[in-house]
Amino acid sequence: GEEIARGEILVDYLLALEPDDVEESVDGIETIEPAYGIPSKWIRPENRDKAEMYGYTVIEPLAVMLSHLSETIKRHSHELMSRQEVVRLVENLKKTAPELCEEAFPGVISYNLLQRVLTMLLREGISIKDLETIVETCFETISENGLPVKDVDQIVEKVRAALKRTITRMYCEDGNMKVVTIDAALERTMVNSLSRGENGMYLAL
């Protein structure tokens, strides 16, 4: 296999993540937290209380490793979405939504189409836990709107809209979301400049 990530753990130390506004520093070995790229320090356990008092977030070595492993899997999960995995997911969905699966597969939604939809969502970091909503949206988009099955981009656009709560939750912190707005005229220009090519939508400015 090929290496996709690496990191280093100092088992006799704790990892202290630096706060945004460091007022006091603690002694330690400077490093970068591997999962999110946060400036950090490996500190001795006896310095834990001091680090936390200064605003550092202190993490055990095992938690660092598990976090790095989890984030690495998330970033590359789209590469793991094989045809066999799609079949397994559909078989599990049949247990909770048998009528939907009977209508959708394989007459309207092919396993190949669902694989492409799920892969695109995972590549964007969107959770596919709500598989029933994803499949139902694909089914409705294709059967009711008469959308060509080959137009995966438009199908995924409909799925994103159906997963709006899941997606917005990803960017919320304590129930609040930070946003950036642009001038309405610029927004219209960008929307009107959207073009569709072989590789999906792009801005033709």
Label every PLM stretch briefly.
Residues 1-205:
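Membrane-embedded alpha-helical signal segments
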